[in-house]
A protein has these predicted regions:
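Intrinsically disordered, low-complexity regions enriched in serine/threonine
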Residues: 1-59, 123, 140-354
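An N-terminal amphipathic alpha-helical segment
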Residues: 55-75
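A short, surface-exposed helix-loop junction/capping segment
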Residues: 69-95
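Short, solvent-exposed coil/turn segments at beta-strand boundaries
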Residues: 84, 113, 158-160
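Long, C-terminal folded domains that constitute the functional core of proteins
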Residues: 91, 130-134, 257-260, 270
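Amphipathic alpha-helical segments
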Residues: 94-118
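Short, well-structured alpha-helical interface segments that form or flank functional binding sites
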Residues: 99-107, 126, 130-132, 149
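Beta-rich nucleic-acid/ligand-interaction surfaces
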Residues: 120-140
Length: 354
């Protein structure tokens, strides 16, 4: 039995509201309290009074003063705000078009129902800078004896930080590891920019289901290719090092005539070797923890000795071990640094096997 516990899906642990009983996007928005609207507004600059400067306040141009500061309109500068509570969300460009929460997701209504997709969770980051809705797809793929379920994560940002995104998200069932669905991160998404034509570009739910089914087939082929690639423990140790070390650190490690022994000394946290290579204790702890998860993680014994097992050591570390929680965990796994490392790990698993 593994000493590790599963941390659940990226959107677990108090994030969002469960919406599995909802049929339409409108019901989802209402139940998750996301049924508010966003508008665009002009911005003003706050500047202190200047003894030698222009302190004239021209109210006809929208200027005003307050507590020792002058406020003037910023030309061609815009922000977004929630209309229900008048809370600012972010700064956006002139051509940015607001896409309301309901408009971003209601196209998927015809794909929800029995033998179709099911809404799972809906919620927000911050006060609404980004909102998300997840849906479980009626598509399960097999990797050897492993089952991998497939989800879609819809997100809509209101702070100008990202497009409307539809992210394909495979989850390994036994351990709830989040996996990457493609070698290129960009191939894991359908992206729609906040422009005049955004709503027209949103496809029907039936089209998204067809795209998801095709995507799941290619993902299954990708994972099964990893499953038949053999890797020894020494090769996995090297793989995890190559994933985490910088090029400079790799070069210093290569200076050892007996690299294999030097690698084992690193994994034993030998101070002299770590100092020579220039690797920090924090980074070495991450490397060792990844290898320990490879050896004893949830569902790892069944896939040890393969590139599939090596890759899942990395995804399992970020899904179940790394010190991430709540909104920070979800953001990192789906969109941020953890996702980027896991994507590099997927590519490296193939490169190391060649």
């Amino acid at each position: 039995m593994s000493k590790y516990n599963t941390n659940g899906l990226p959107w677990s642990h108090g994030l969002g509201k469960e919406v599995t009983d909802c049929v339409t996007a409108k019901e989802v928005m209402q139940k998750a309290k996301l049924d508010w609207t966003v508008e665009k507004c002009e911005l003003v600059a706050k500047m202190p009074f200047n003894i030698n400067g222009n302190n004239d306040v021209d109210e006809r141009n929208g200027d005003f003063s307050y507590k020792g500061n002058i406020y003037r309109e910023c030309p061609k500068a815009y922000g977004t705000y929630r209309t229900d509570v008048n809370l600012p969300l972010g700064i956006v460009k002139d051509k940015y078009k607001v896409v309301q929460n309901l408009d971003a997701f209601d196209f998927f209504d015809d794909a929800i129902g029995k033998d179709k997709a099911l809404w799972q969770k809906a919620g927000l980051f911050g006060v609404g800078q980004k909102i998300f809705v997840t849906a479980k797809l009626p598509i399960t793929i097999k990797v050897g004896n492993d089952e991998v379920e497939n989800y879609l994560v819809f997100s809509n940002s209101h702070d100008g930080s990202s497009s409307i995104n539809i992210l394909f998200t495979p989850i390994r069932v036994i351990c709830t590891n989040m996996l990457n669905s493609a070698l290129k991160n960009s191939d894991s998404y359908i992206r729609i920019r906040h422009t005049e034509s955004a709503k027209e570009k949103l496809q029907t739910g039936a089209e998204i289901l067809r795209i998801a089914a095709k995507h799941a087939t290619s993902t299954q082929e990708l994972y099964n290719a990893l499953q038949v690639i053999n890797m020894s423990d020494d090769e996995v140790m090297k793989y995890i090092l190559n994933l985490n070390l910088t090029e400079q650190e790799k070069g210093l490690l290569a200076e050892y005539s007996d690299t294999k022994t030097a690698i084992k000394r690193l994994y034993n946290r030998d101070f002299t070797t770590m100092e020579h290579v220039g690797v920090s204790t924090r980074k070495m702890n991450t490397i060792v923890n990844m290898f320990e998860y490879y050896m004893d993680g949830i569902g790892q014994k069944e896939i040890a000795g393969t590139a599939w097992g090596a890759y899942n050591a990395v995804t399992g570390f970020y899904s179940n071990v790394a010190n991430l929680s709540g909104e920070k965990r979800m953001d990192s796994l789906l969109y941020g640094s953890a996702n980027n490392v896991m994507n590099r790990a997927l590519n490296l698993a193939f490169a190391e096997a060649v």
